[in-house]
Amino acid sequence: MPAAVIGGIATHYEVTGDGPPLLMFSPGGFSATLSNWTSLGIYARLRLVDHLARSYTCIMFDRRESGGSGGRVERITWPDYAAQGKGLLDHLGIPRAHLMGGCVGCSAVAVFAASWPDAAASMVLYSPAGGARYRITQQSRFAQHLSYYSERGGAAVVDLAQTSGQVFTKDPRLGPWASVIRADPAFADRYRHQDPAGYQTIVAGMARLLFDRDTVPGPEPEDLLRLQIPALIVPGQDASHATSAARYLEECLPRAQYWDVPVSGQTERTAPARVLEFLASAESQ
């Protein structure tokens, strides 16, 4: 798998298919890997990549601190996640692309479009993460990690990450840098010996700013209201992907199309066809 260094952090990515570029921000929360597009939940069932790659050049990547990508201990923000995707386009020499996000990737897509509107041909926002229960769950996850770190220290987190094979979403004690600890011995050593008070301040701020609302986190509504970029919104319907989050995006995006179909009606026959129909219409505008 090829890798690009973006903002000093290695990004593992994959390009498949042929046609106009489609930059895909992976689903999967704090384990947002490119493989999730073909192996995780609804995305595996719909086989979206198989269908999209027939008409588009699909550019997928492991989000920073996920999978084979690297990371850095800092107060990570949604603009940081969006900048990783923009940096990948720059690395590939692509000035403009369609954007697609699944789950948590929708937040990064919306921030990307608000930050670099000229680089965004359209947005597909599939099952956006958000909602009150989503916020509560995420903040609780960070609180559990901080409690474990405070009691046991960085060395215990490193030892746990290197022996458990789990990720932050499955075991909150690990924190959001577990995959980097596991893959990079030098990073693990720095993590083990970092300043505890400074680290806890970083993590507390990260949790507060990433998950600060009971809808789609990331983009500010005032920025979305000004975006003149075609968008297709496909709703989710569970504790992490509240339908209200999708409706919020519909309310805020002036050129939004809302595919009002329940998750049970989103099938391999219907969903890829709807996404392809939207992308084709955006191409013609």
Language-model-detected regions and their locations in the chain:
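Catalytic active-site module of serine/aspartate enzymes centered on a nucleophile-bearing elbow/loop
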Residues: 254-285
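Conserved acidic catalytic loop of the alpha/beta-hydrolase fold
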Residues: 79-97
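Conserved HGGG/HGGXW glycine-rich cap/lid loop of the alpha/beta-hydrolase fold
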Residues: 6-70
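Conserved alpha/beta-hydrolase "acid-adjacent" motif
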Residues: 239-245
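Short beta-strand/loop motif that positions the catalytic acidic residue
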Residues: 226-227, 233-235
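Hydrophobic, aromatic-rich cap/lid helix
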Residues: 178-219
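Flexible "cap/lid" loop of the alpha/beta hydrolase fold
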Residues: 114-115, 119-152
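Gly/Ala-rich beta-loop-alpha elbow adjacent to hydrolase catalytic centers
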Residues: 101-109
